[in-house]
Amino acid sequence: MPMPPDESALSLLPDHPLAAHNTFGIDARARYAARITHPAQFEALHRDARVATLPHLVLGGGSNVVFTRDFDGLVLLDEIAGRRVVRDDDDAWYVEAGGGENWHAFVGWTLEHGMAGLENLALIPGTVGAAPIQNIGAYGLEMNAYFDSLVAVELATGRSERFDAARCAFGYRDSFFKRDGRGRFAIVSVTFRLPKRWTPRLGYADVTRELEARGISPDAATPRDVFDAVVAIRRAKLPDPRELGNAGSFFKNPVIDRAQFDALHARAPGIVSYPQPDGRVKLAAGWLIDRCGWKGRALGAAAVHDRQALVLVNRGGATGADVLALARAIQHDVRTQFGVELEPEPVCL
């Protein structure tokens, strides 16, 4: 009788090219790479003498990373799949997805099955497993609003752990996994709580304008209407990484205190801003970058997109160092002109 396959077996790919595994399309290489299709492979890493002592990097869609050099370690390509309704109650569905699932496809799947809530996050690049790390957000919604829990493997021990929202310590484009947990865990699956009573989030004018342009009253919009509107907006504003390498929004929208904002507003009355519940004010980073004259400009093969100043692009052949140099030049000009610090969203390695 043939032996069943070993789900923990790890097939190593030496000197593996990474251009196809990051949305910037930056040409870098990993000492080793391995495709992970089952949680047991994460759990067995610490027992594999070939790679146990190497640095590890988990990659999903590669939409939140900029390689400035080759990676002298093991890149784990998270391809763990699966989507299912774990349970439901009177108020909500609890939906689990594998860490390697494509995020946009997962959002579409929830709507196809009558479970709304995530539609404002349509077309964000990357995987389900990357979504909590970054606490992705768009058009008035952040992922943690519908987050229930996740399962992650501690790579050094192979131990699986469940994290609730409090333990994930979500912040604006931030979480425990970007700080203290960075590089220590691989996210195997994420569970979302999607309410059975849908509450549309239409606070962004771009979304309501797109709905109205489609002949849809915002008051009558369905979850699918919002999904389609968000997809149309993002496609109009953001380049397709398959055609022009990019990582989506490169900088976080900075949040400043009210006193700083009042002083800034006096100097720049047209500044685009969004009041926050805690009294602080979020600024539109794209507006700041545009006002510094960077939209459409380039440094070498790295450039600022000509339609969306928040997006840096690879015009062809850009290195990670090129992208980083462009980002630093933009940060310098925004700091000089507005006294505001811009923080990159992607991790630069």
Swiss-Prot record:
**Highest taxon above the source species:** Bacteria
Q: Provide the E.C. number(s) assigned to this enzyme.
A: 1.3.1.98
Q: Where does the record place the catalytic residues?
A: 173, 249 (proton donor), 345
The record's keywords, sorted A to Z, are: Cell cycle, Cell division, Cell shape, Cell wall biogenesis/degradation, Cytoplasm, FAD, Flavoprotein, NADP, Oxidoreductase, Peptidoglycan synthesis
Q: Name one GO molecular function term.
A: UDP-N-acetylmuramate dehydrogenase activity
Cellular compartments annotated: Cytoplasm
Pfam families (UniProt xref): FAD_binding_4 (PF01565), MurB_C (PF02873)
Q: Which NCBIfam families match?
A: murB, PRK00046.1, PRK13903.1
Q: What does this protein do?
A: Cell wall formation.
Please report the name of this protein according to its UniProt entry. UDP-N-acetylenolpyruvoylglucosamine reductase
* UniProt organism field: Burkholderia multivorans (strain ATCC 17616 / 249)
